[in-house]
Design a protein with these regions (language model features):
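Active-site-proximal helix-loop-helix substrate-binding element of RNase H-like nuclease domains
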Residues: 32, 37, 41-58, 63-146
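Entry/capping segment at the start of metal-dependent catalytic domains
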Residues: 1-30
Length: 146
């Protein structure tokens, strides 16, 4: 394995927009719900962690291996969340050396900072669905009591 593309969905009661990713993952109720990945450009696989599925040892080792290049849109978020998920000691995170951020690469080329915006500008056949965005917000963002 040379590369792994990663996309995760998470939950935390902490508002990430107001507090940032570090506080977000420190919440007692933080969890990774879904882990999608593709190895060396192959078929995308989805691990439903929220329903008891587990990452294979091969994937865990790839996350820890600095020789495997990890790609993600907003890689900093994925890296910090997965550091917590892997139960690394507090203040210890996966090494950024082996991570590549497609959001930053997109911005470098003058594209929007959102995955949805990049898809629109590039005219990609498969776009981020608005319904999916709404579902993620519903399941991954805690509700404010009324």
């Amino acid at each position: 394995m040379k590369t792994i593309n990663i996309d995760i969905e998470t939950f935390s009661s902490i508002n990430i927009s107001k507090s940032g990713v570090y506080k977000y993952v420190e919440s007692e109720d933080f969890e990774v719900l879904l882990f999608a990945y593709s190895i060396d450009g192959g078929k995308t696989e989805i691990v439903d962690i929220a329903n008891g599925e587990e990452l294979s040892e091969e994937i865990i080792q790839a996350l820890l291996d600095d020789n495997v290049i990890k790609w993600a849109f907003n890689a900093q978020f994925e890296r910090i969340c997965l550091s917590r998920f892997l139960k690394l000691p507090k203040g210890t995170y996966l090494n950024p050396k082996s991570w590549r951020c497609t959001m930053i690469w997109s911005a470098y080329m003058g594209l929007p900072f959102s995955l949805e915006g990049v898809g629109k500008v590039l005219g990609l056949e498969k776009q981020k669905l608005i319904e999916g965005k709404d579902l993620i917000k519903y399941f991954c963002v805690s509700c404010t009591p009324t």
